[in-house]
């Protein structure tokens, strides 16, 4: 056997022993352009036992076969380490993957580099999942056990379904600190707590409340007991119907439960849960979520048995609250839409009861099946730990072969550069710098969950869209700048000085001679229009819609600010809207003059204004608009109260007849 150094055309180099033109014995080989390094033993051109070091500092130490990692070995990648078996370059069959910074780890079976079969996953906060896996996701039967509520991780960005496991890992091996435990759980909840619901039905009931909503008291003629329990701590009386709740479930449930990637300022209010409370789910899993039949139980006595969909109570089931009361029926996105309660006309009561009973039986069977799968997962975990210990011994042997190969390479070619140790030193130095300067990385953490460049989710915007969106949003933003500066400031001054309708009429009359002093014909034509602008500007829908495009709220404009606006023709025509946008720029300084002069003459002009209001009936519609609105406002509650009293009498009569019969 001979040896030496051989330089490849792609920039790689081999330095070590060879036989019959192939690497044999001990040696070091670098990849193209000198990137990456393998050092260890060789056999007729293939690696046998040794270690490979990537330029990033990631390493593998163990056994090889046909140029691929095969057998036992240890891989260190970023903040994660895998110890166990390898099969043709992929992780499997048994192995342990653990975090170097947190308690997060997975112990069990693998297939094609993903969790598959049976295993136990421990999350960053200490919670566990024991059961079946498929394609790297929880799939089958399993048990999810949380830690006490006070120690559970707060979910802030629902990107992944594991707290700090493989599916929370970025491409460079690092872990997202804000990874979530449930993709469809609201931001701000705790990992492993899916029964932590605020009063979703009650919040929705407030939006669609009232006795006169369609399908309530008169719609279905169905009365419920005062037992609306949609959360742990909030139990309030209500009168609801199935039709009303079915409308609430789809739209309002999404607005109160599913928050997606939002800041925690908009998180739902959490229920008052004791810090020592734990939660356990036993049942079916599909695609890494609670789907099918299952039982979720808390240590404080709350329990749900029934059907699940996407980590939510969905289907038929029964909820038992800590005080012993029950809520059973059909759920839709965590909201009870059909309950089993006393009704005037018991329609579908028996069918609902049968479906609930079947759902409870199915949930109990699924929980029993999950417990049996846990036993199998624990046995697989014990075997995986044994393989991990054997992999440590294989890594030790690989390091010894690596040291021999480096010594041989130094003897054959003393000037040969071995990049492997420098890769490891560079990675270690980066870790030390990160620990010494933690303050520099603290402000960099918040933007990572928002950008998350290493994740792709269906429906997300491609990376090129943000480049075009600022250009599109910048051009319209430049035009409303003068409007923002003029309208709110002048409107605020006028609102402080003139708070009543009479004062606004005074300003319209006082400003009339000021505007008529202009010698041009345009100003003279605009003068009578300024009288109506102060009165009709608030109820004008077209003008309000125009300014809501720029400001997001209705802007109150006075007569001296926009003299050329034709309010009488402002019923949605394009000419009036264009005048509102372009003409105020020509009269930028006119509002300042018109505001200062009427203030000085305001005390003298008050008696004239009162006389002019009585003498000049130029706009009777504007003068009578406010009293008409007041009459309608005063007559509205009276009619509502009359109908309310009638309906209450009818309801009491129906109840009286019902109790007598």
Curated annotation (Swiss-Prot):
Disease field reads: Congenital myopathy 25: A form of congenital myopathy, a clinically and genetically heterogeneous group of muscle disorders characterized by hypotonia and muscle weakness apparent at birth, and specific pathological features on muscle biopsy. CMYO25 is an autosomal recessive form characterized by prominent facial, ocular, and bulbar features.
Gene Ontology terms: biological process: calcium ion transport into cytosol; muscle organ development; regulation of cardiac muscle contraction by calcium ion signaling; regulation of release of sequestered calcium ion into cytosol by sarcoplasmic reticulum
The cross-references to SMART domains, in alphabetical order and at most eight, read: MORN
Instruction: List modified residues, type Phosphoserine.
Output: 157, 216, 220, 452, 465, 469, 475
Q: Which family does it belong to?
A: Belongs to the junctophilin family.
Main localization of the protein described in the UniProt heading: membrane
Task: Name the InterPro entries on file.
Answer: Junctophilin, MORN
Organism per entry: Homo sapiens
Q: In which tissues or organs does this protein occur?
A: Abundantly expressed in skeletal muscle. Very low levels in heart.
List where the protein spans the membrane.
Answer: 640-660
Q: Which UniProt keywords apply?
A: Cell membrane, Disease variant, Endoplasmic reticulum, Membrane, Phosphoprotein, Repeat, Sarcoplasmic reticulum, Transmembrane, Transmembrane helix
Q: Know anything about its domains from the record?
A: The MORN (membrane occupation and recognition nexus) repeats contribute to the plasma membrane binding, possibly by interacting with phospholipids.
Q: What is this protein called?
A: Junctophilin-1
Cite the repeat ranges for MORN: 14-36, 38-59, 60-82, 106-128, 129-151, 281-303, 304-326
Region Disordered: start-end pairs: 228-247, 433-631
Q: State the gene name recorded for this protein.
A: JPH1
Please tell me one Gene Ontology term that the record gives under cellular component.
nucleoplasm
């Amino acid at each position: 056997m001979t040896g030496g150094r051989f330089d490849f055309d792609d920039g790689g180099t081999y330095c070590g022993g060879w036989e019959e033109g192939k690497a044999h014995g001990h040696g070091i080989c670098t990849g193209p352009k000198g990137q990456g390094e393998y050092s260890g033993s060789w056999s007729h051109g293939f690696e046998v036992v040794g270690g490979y070091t990537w330029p990033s500092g990631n390493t593998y130490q163990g056994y090889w076969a046909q140029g691929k990692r095969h057998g036992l070995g240890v891989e260190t990648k970023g903040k994660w380490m895998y110890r166990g078996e390898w099969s043709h370059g992929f992780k499997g069959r048994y192995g342990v993957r653990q975090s170097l910074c947190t308690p997060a780890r997975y112990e069990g079976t693998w297939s094609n580099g993903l969790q598959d079969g049976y295993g136990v996953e421990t999350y960053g906060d200490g919670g566990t999942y024991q059961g079946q896996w498929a394609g790297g996701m929880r799939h089958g039967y399993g048990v999810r056990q949380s830690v006490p509520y006070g120690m559970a991780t707060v979910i802030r960005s629902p990107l992944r379904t594991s707290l700090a496991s493989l599916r929370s890992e970025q491409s460079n091996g690092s872990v997202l600190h804000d990874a979530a435990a449930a993709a469809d759980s609201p931001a701000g909840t705790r990992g492993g707590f899916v029964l932590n619901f605020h009063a979703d039905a009650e919040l929705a009931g407030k939006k669609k409340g009232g006795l006169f909503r369609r399908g309530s008291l008169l719609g279905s003629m169905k009365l419920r007991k005062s037992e609306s329990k949609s959360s742990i701590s909030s139990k309030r009386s209500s009168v609801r119907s199935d039709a009303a709740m079915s409308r609430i479930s789809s739209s309002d449930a999404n607005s109160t439960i599913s928050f997606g990637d939002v800041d925690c300022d908009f998180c739902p209010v959490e229920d008052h849960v004791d810090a020592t409370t734990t939660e356990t789910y036993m049942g079916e899993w599909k695609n890494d979520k609670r789907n099918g039949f299952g039982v979720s139980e808390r240590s404080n006595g709350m329990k749900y048995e029934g059907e699940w969909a996407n980590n939510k109570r969905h289907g038929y089931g029964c909820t038992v609250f800590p005080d012993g009361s029950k809520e059973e029926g059909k759920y839709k996105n965590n909201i009870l839409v059909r309950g089993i309660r006393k009704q005037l006309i018991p329609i579908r009561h028996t069918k609902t009861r049968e479906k609930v009973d079947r759902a409870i039986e199915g949930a109990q069977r699924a929980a029993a099946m999950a417990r049996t799968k846990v036993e199998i997962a624990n046995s697989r975990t014990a075997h995986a730990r044994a393989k991990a210990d054997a992999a440590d011994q294989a890594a030790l042997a690989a390091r010894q072969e690596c040291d021999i190969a480096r010594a041989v390479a130094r003897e054959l070619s003393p000037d040969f550069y071995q990049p492997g140790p420098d890769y490891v030193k560079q990675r270690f130095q980066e870790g030390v710098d990160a620990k010494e300067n933690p303050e520099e990385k603290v402000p960099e953490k918040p933007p990572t969950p928002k950008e998350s460049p290493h994740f792709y989710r269906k429906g997300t915007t491609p990376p090129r869209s943000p480049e075009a969106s600022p250009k599109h949003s910048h051009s319209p933003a430049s035009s409303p700048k003068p409007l923002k500066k003029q309208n709110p400031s002048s409107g605020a001054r006028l609102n402080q000085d003139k708070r009543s309708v009479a004062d606004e009429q005074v300003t319209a009359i006082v400003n009339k001679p000021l505007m008529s002093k202009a010698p041009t014909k345009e100003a003279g034509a605009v003068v009578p229009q300024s009288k109506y602008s102060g009165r009709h500007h608030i109820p004008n829908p077209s003008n309000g819609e125009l300014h809501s495009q720029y400001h997001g709220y209705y802007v109150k404009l006075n007569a001296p600010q926009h003299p050329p606006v034709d309010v009488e023709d402002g019923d949605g025509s394009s000419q009036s809207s264009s005048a509102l946008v372009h003409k105020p720029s020509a009269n930028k300084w006119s509002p300042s003059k018109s505001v200062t002069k009427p203030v000085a003459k305001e005390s003298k002009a008050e008696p004239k204004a009162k006389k002019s209001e009585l003498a000049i009936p130029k706009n009777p519609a504007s003068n009578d608009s406010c009293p008409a609105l007041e009459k309608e406002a005063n007559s509205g509650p009276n009619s509502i109260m009359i109908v309310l009293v009638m309906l209450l009498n009818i309801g009491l009569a129906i109840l009286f007849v019902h109790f007598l019969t």
